[in-house]
Amino acid sequence: MSFAVSAEAYAAFMGRFSEPLAPLFADLAGAGIGAGQRALDVGCGPGAMTAELARRLGPAAVWAVEPSESFARAAARREPAAWVGQAAAEHLPFPDDVFDLAAAQLVVHFMTDPVGGLREMGRVTRPGGVVAACVWDHAGGRGPLSAFWRAVRELDPAADDESGLPGVRAGHLAELFVRAGLGGTEATTLTVHVRHASFEEWWERFTLGVGPAGAYLASLDADHQAALREQCRRLLPANPIEISATAWAATGRT
């Protein structure tokens, strides 16, 4: 996956959606979690969910891990009183049973081993604690990048999009929770609405080279990029452009 980019590029590309998603996800994941309890943000990126958890629990009660060094540094700058380290979900650097909540916002579909990553989240969560995750509904065409990938498929039917990633189709995220041994799994959806003042504002973020969408665009020559841009323009409404993005979400208990 193309996440060898700056934290600023990632925040510009996905932060417009992950920032409003974080409070909704925290409401779901953190129900029943309060003062005196500890939370872990897995795959924290530049820190959208980390900051939301810190706002609710206090930064001293929040830990975060992120495999990208630049993203981890950005999260640490954003929440300097929280503990932020560099680690992958599949190999969490914590003993068993230390957190009341382990949450992964927009991460599971990019894990090398999603079941293993969720199992690790369960391992570090105390008995009766909560494990939570959410991923965009890429397979159902309700993700924040769905218009882009629809345009891609219309021009290049053989292109790989994000619809085959783990957890992005109906029921699959909850299935991964069950396979990871988490009990009491419940599934729902979370939806955010993001307004772009113009098509140019919407399109510019894709040129930053972030994630599979950015990598695909970067792989095209100038003529094919221009054709894709115009195809996207035809698919999107007139300015301003409002994108509704829906994520699958699941919770389970250890």
Residue ranges and their predicted role:
Residues 3, 17-18, 46-48, 165-254:
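Conserved Class I S-adenosyl-L-methionine
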Residues 100-114, 137:
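A short SAM/SAH-binding and catalytic strip from SAM-dependent methyltransferases
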